[in-house]
Amino acid sequence: STQGYSSAASDVYKRQVYMCYKSVTGPIEYDDQKTIRDNAIIARLIEIRKAQIEYKNMYKTHAGSFDDLEKFLNTDKLPFLIKEGVLTDEQLEKGMTEAEAVKKGLIRRDTMWVLAKDTLLGKNYDVAAMRYVPAVPGEKITFKMDTATLKSGSGYEIKVFACEVPYKEYLRDMDAQLTYNLIDKAEKQGKFPGLRVGSLEEINNNAGNWE
């Protein structure tokens, strides 16, 4: 019947409109979800970098594993300067130094030794979770982390580290074609297909590849 044909045609039209809508919203939804994950992962990589920098300050090399980094954060202590009072404009004009003001009891400067975790990341920070990639549902993903020694242009040996997670892991449950496109684009540009802080191939001052 004409009515049946009209209904079928309407269904086809609706499906076409829906597919067209999905082709637009699919990438938008993908980008939105990727941004949420990117932001959480970048925040975690910045925390790892902060811990690695202080680890190197203490041990002259980076932590080769998360076990070593966790032990450092949970057991080692870092100096924390307590400041009470500041030099007044009048004292500064008279050339008084902080050391002189401390000696005279006008201001206070004391050093306390505080757990590395508390100083760098806060008392409530979950150190045990540091090794895991955040914001990804399902089975936990562990960041890949490694260290190396590189030679600078002037011949100095420089200790470096890298910590990373590839797109294929942290976007594993999202649109496979869109993830493939991301990976393909990064590889064609000679870039790491994912998020990484530091590098084992070049001296980049612990930069993140999002910076």
Where are these regions (language model features)?
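Low-complexity, acidic interaction segments enriched in glycine
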Residues: N57, T61-E211
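N-terminal alpha-helical signal peptides/signal-anchor transmembrane segments
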Residues: D38-Y59
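Amphipathic alpha-helical segments typified by the pilin-like N-terminal helix
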Residues: G4, Y18-A40
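Short, small-residue-biased leader/transition segments that mark boundaries at the very start
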Residues: T2-Y5, A9-Y13
